[in-house]
């Protein structure tokens, strides 16, 4: 399971700016890992409910435990599945911090990161966009009209992400 970092806090803060405490929304967290994103969002927005998915059974179990510790287990449902195979409902908000480090950059990561986190939670394929491509494509089917997609991306991935979003009519 990926260890949350300050960049992920920024993702959560940006979501908080988009929605008020009074709104009632459905949230989908793709690649939930420890559950830190959806748990942080739901803890701050009491009228939100969520679904969290991950391909790792271990990650799902950790996320369930964390949700229970924060008294949110009745507001989050967890599924062990990939984004490719997920077709349940439509959502107001989709969030994700997927693996986005390119295969070439992985070898340059700090040993502290590589020694404690599964490569599956870090590497996003040859160009870092394997999972992004799946998420963006699927989000066009899973978002309600007017829904939002909020993703954490790498420092050098902005223009490639904009191109991908345009391809799937997000911008």
Model-derived features: where do they sit?
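Mobile active-site "lid"/loop adjacent to the S-adenosyl-L-methionine
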Residues: 100-131
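Conserved SAM/SAH cofactor-binding pocket of Class I
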Residues: 7-108
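Class I S-adenosylmethionine-dependent transferase superfamily signal
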Residues: 15, 41, 113, 135-139
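Conserved Class I SAM-dependent methyltransferase catalytic core
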Residues: 126-171
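Glycine/small-residue-rich loop that forms an oxyanion/phosphate-binding "nest" at active or ligand-binding sites
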Residues: 3
